[in-house]
Amino acid sequence: MKEVDLGKSLDREMSLWRYMSIDKFIDLLSNQKLFLTPLAYYQSSDPFEGFVPKVAFEATMKIFIDRIEEAEAAGVEIEKLLRERVSSPTTEQLEAIEKMKAMSKAHRESLIPLNNKISKSTCVHCWYHSESESEAMWKLYSDSGKGIAIKTSVAALVDSLNVCNQDVPLRLGRVKYLDFLSNELTPKDCVIDGATSPLLKRKEYEHENEVRLYSVPQLMTAERWESYEPRPILVKVDVSSLIENIYISPYVGEPFTSSVRKICELLGVPNEKVINSKLLENYEKMLAGFVKV
């Protein structure tokens, strides 16, 4: 059984929010699965998704290029020794040498496309970190104001996944926001919770304050990656332990509010977990309730 690999930047008590439309909420309750989206699918909203700053990309490429050059140097040495010790190498020996050279060339040519393919195929499920509701998140992720927000914690999210028998590796980490074009960035700046691309975004998106659950397809070989097309991953989750509270959008009234409560009742969510957002509640009335005159 695979358990979630929890990033060190996260505290288990941190509050997390997931804002969504009612149809996605019903789908979650009905199917008991989280939808992880390939980074490739976010191209329209953020063309930099799946990419890293130049300094991080160069450092990553250097690691792989160094390995290729080590293999090439070993190949050159083998060929040199062979020609020194054997006056007339056999056809099979010469073919083996040429095959090594061709493999090295292919590895070099596929290095950047393969790196991009792996990054774009990484699947993520995003949560907003805050101890309170966010007016901006309501507007961004509800359907014309008709939406709900699930409130949970890092601990509840991890535990709700771990009780299910996961068949894909899952990691949870906090997104780091950087100026991708800054000349002062170092490779170390571009690592968070042991990862780069799935947990790096531009500073322009810092308002999202994201915590990401993510998974990288385990294909292993370059040949399999070449034919792979990014696709979503569905992971099982125990919704009853995931949900601490459900908040109903502050931009709606009846019959939406009672409809959400009925849906929750039918799908097994206790009524005491369902809360009407007080984000836009009349503050003058609230003050009157605070002070007795």
Give the label of every model feature segment.
Residues M1-V293:
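Partner-binding and oligomerization surfaces adjacent to conserved cores of proteins
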